[in-house]
Curated annotation (Swiss-Prot):
It is found in: Cytoplasm. This is Exodeoxyribonuclease 7 small subunit. GO terms for biological process: DNA catabolic process. The lineage of its organism: Bacteria, Pseudomonadati, Pseudomonadota, Betaproteobacteria, Burkholderiales. Belongs to the XseB family. The gene is xseB. PANTHER family: EXODEOXYRIBONUCLEASE 7 SMALL SUBUNIT. One of its GO terms (molecular function) is exodeoxyribonuclease VII activity. SUPFAM superfamilies: XseB-like (SSF116842).
Amino acid sequence: MAKTASPGATPPGNGTEPLPDNYEMALAELETLVARMEGGALSLEDSLTAYRRGATLVAFCQQQLEKVEQQVRVLDGATLKPLSSGTAATDGEDDDL
């Protein structure tokens, strides 16, 4: 089923909207929701619906980022190491940059 809602339409309240196809689409929808909510023109009920949708989109984006991070780790052969706070302070080589 194709999505036919226009960007200015009231968010549907059924909570069954499909997830976007990718991270970029989710982020764009999230930015639109935030702008509409900040605009102050939504009713309380519509704001709550938009908030719920936004929370779903945030979770989707986090999952997508975690998947990509895992793929990067695999491609790097698990050579990624966290930067310890002591390493940056004792290095001293790039302090003048």
